[in-house]
């Protein structure tokens, strides 16, 4: 055989391919062998009886409807059928011919279909247009042939008309129901069958579909109870394993979105892969629960409750057409009244004399034997008892450090503004065209909103819809005062009523000023009379015949040498000194006589 030299200078021998018989369809590559476990006879079941203990008695059967041709080659595989009547399949019913279970598992490589010998163009038959045999949905039994099918196949010509040969050395039996449509071998087998079929091929009259029928056995109470017990035990063990299992988180994305409070301790951080930036995330719901977790949770709950209460107050103010601060003021007044009632009740209560006032100094007590001793009870002061008595009417609050968290918006005066409805916007533009930019009048239409909020809404609308604002301001509407009073739900009155009230106020003011002048004059007269009486009483004669005014003048110039007490003390000291000298002289005289 001559060799060929390619462009690179490499000499190689061409491959020799054997000739194939001409076929009517397009040539297709040989697909991978689908692996099915099909028991051939009872002898194989007896040889493998040790492996059949856990398998159910009901087995699936591959049944082929009678066809005109006893043997048909399919991409290198031989499938045999019988020429029986349709009554053989009719006994099973329509339920038995089920489709393939999509959730079954892929079987192991136990059995392969027998490759068919190559056929000539004369012997080649038109391939069947039916799809591959569907598999049963029942996973409780393994495939098996029906007796009629096995008998007919055994009577056919030789071993070439058998479906497949099965090895006696089977390591393990696997159910056919575990084959899924996702099996790669099955998919390639189907694809090559479709590609190998010619477009002009027609389904012959005797061609029938090969279907796998599962035998349905009636359930028993024992099997159902056993299955339930096994399932419950498996679920309980799986739950216990899940409860005791710990998880290692290597990325922030691996953290579950919803983690229960009790399960957060099961998640651990991979210290080698985690960075400080990831650890500084604001929400990191894994790890051991600290002591402050419950406090923060309670603070968050209280914050949401307060927010809900304010929302209800705003809704109530909108419905009752009242300002929001009036509702809050009513609540504050009610709380203050309750505190006053509790305080008055405590003050009017009868408190024992011992509890009324605590002793500030150590006291003495008389013992039964007549001796005096220190009262030990007065040496101890119970401040908590005194505080509880004095502050019993006050409200006791346990402070939570997480309740009042401060940020850049904590010290601002901004309040939440409810969104404006369509009716409010219509009223707003109508008021603009009627009253202009007098926001004091416009804010009366919205008592549950402040003037600041109305002005902010005007500025916002002027930015978003300047044309509408310009049209509303230029198209002046005639002011309707009665309609305005009806909308604000107030009776302002007419100009005549206003003038009458003004005259009444002026008269009251004049009368009040007259009363003030009269009070000033009477007070001035009283001061003058009191001054005259004081002057008359001051300038009187004293005990020495000197007037009080002259005595004051003399006392300003006199010098004080001492007081009477000082003179008495001085005289007493002199007497004592004289007595001491007399005593000393009397003691010296007897000594001289001796």
Swiss-Prot record:
InterPro entries: Bdp1_fungi (IPR017174), Homeodomain-like_sf (IPR009057), SANT/Myb (IPR001005), TFIIIB_B''_Myb (IPR039467). Signal peptide: none annotated. Residues 150-168 have a biased composition (Polar residues). PANTHER family: RNA POLYMERASE III TRANSCRIPTION INITIATION FACTOR B, TRANSCRIPTION FACTOR TFIIIB COMPONENT B'' HOMOLOG. Belongs to the TFC5 family. TFIIIB comprises the TATA-binding protein (TBP), the B-related factor (BRF) and the B'' component (BDP1). Interacts with TFC4. This is Transcription factor TFIIIB component B''. The gene is BDP1.
């Amino acid at each position: 055989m001559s060799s060929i030299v390619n462009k690179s200078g490499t000499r190689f021998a061409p491959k020799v391919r054997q000739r194939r018989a001409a076929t009517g369809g397009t040539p297709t590559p040989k697909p991978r062998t689908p692996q099915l476990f099909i028991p051939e006879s009872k002898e194989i079941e007896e040889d493998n009886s040790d492996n059949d203990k856990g398998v159910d008695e009901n087995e699936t059967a591959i049944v082929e409807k009678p066809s005109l041709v006893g043997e048909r080659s399919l991409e290198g595989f031989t499938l045999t059928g019988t020429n029986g009547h349709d009554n053989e399949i009719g006994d099973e019913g329509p339920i038995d011919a089920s489709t393939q279970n999509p959730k079954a598992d892929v079987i192991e490589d136990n059995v392969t279909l027998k490759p068919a010998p190559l056929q000539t163009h004369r012997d080649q038959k038109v391939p069947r247009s039916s799809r591959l045999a569907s598999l049963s949905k029942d996973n409780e039994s393994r495939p098996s042939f029906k007796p009629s099918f096995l008998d007919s196949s055994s009577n056919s010509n030789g071993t070439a008309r058998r479906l497949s040969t099965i090895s006696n050395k089977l390591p393990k039996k696997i159910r056919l129901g575990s084959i899924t449509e996702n099996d790669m071998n099955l998919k390639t087998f189907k694809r090559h069958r479709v590609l190998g079929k010619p477009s002009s091929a027609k389904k012959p009259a005797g061609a029938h579909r090969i279907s796998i029928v599962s035998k349905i056995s009636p359930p028993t109470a024992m099997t159902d109870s056993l299955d339930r017990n096994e399932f419950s035990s498996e679920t309980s063990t799986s739950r216990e394993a899940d409860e005791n299992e710990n998880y290692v988180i290597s990325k922030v994305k691996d953290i579950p979105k919803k983690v229960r409070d009790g399960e957060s301790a099961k998640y651990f951080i991979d210290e080698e892969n985690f960075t400080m930036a990831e650890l500084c995330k604001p929400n990191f719901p894994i790890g051991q629960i600290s002591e402050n977790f419950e406090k923060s949770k309670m603070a968050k709950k209280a914050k949401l409750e307060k927010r809900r209460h304010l929302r209800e107050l705003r809704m109530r103010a909108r419905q009752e057409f009242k300002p929001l601060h009036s509702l809050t003021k009513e609540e504050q007044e009610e709380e203050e009244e309750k505190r006053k009632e509790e305080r008055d009740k405590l003050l009017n209560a009868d408190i024992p004399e011992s509890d009324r006032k605590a002793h500030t100094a150590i006291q003495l007590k008389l013992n039964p034997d007549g001796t005096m001793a220190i009262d030990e009870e007065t040496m101890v002061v119970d401040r908590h008892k005194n505080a509880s008595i004095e502050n019993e009417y006050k409200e006791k609050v346990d402070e939570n450090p997480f309740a009042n968290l401060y940020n850049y918006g904590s010290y601002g005066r901004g309040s939440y503004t409810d969104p404006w409805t369509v009716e409010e916007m219509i009223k707003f533009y109508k008021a603009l065209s009627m009253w202009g930019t007098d926001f004091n009048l416009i804010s009366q239409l919205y008592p549950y909103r402040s003037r600041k909020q109305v002005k902010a809404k005007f500025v916002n609308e002027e930015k978003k819809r300047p044309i509408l604002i310009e049209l509303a301001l230029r198209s002046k509407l005639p002011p309707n005062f009665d309609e305005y009073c009806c909308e604000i739900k107030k009776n302002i009155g007419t100009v005549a009523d206003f003038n009458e009230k003004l005259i009444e106020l002026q008269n009251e003011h004049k009368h009040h000023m007259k009363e003030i002048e009269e009070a000033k004059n009477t007070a001035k007269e009283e001061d003058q009379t009191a001054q005259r009486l004081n002057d008359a009483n001051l300038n009187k004669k004293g005990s020495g015949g000197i007037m009080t005014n002259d005595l004051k003048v003399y006392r300003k110039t006199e010098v004080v040498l001492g007081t009477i007490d000082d003179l008495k003390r001085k005289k007493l000291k002199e007497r004592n000194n004289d007595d001491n000298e007399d005593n000393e002289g009397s003691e010296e005289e007897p000594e001289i006589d001796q």
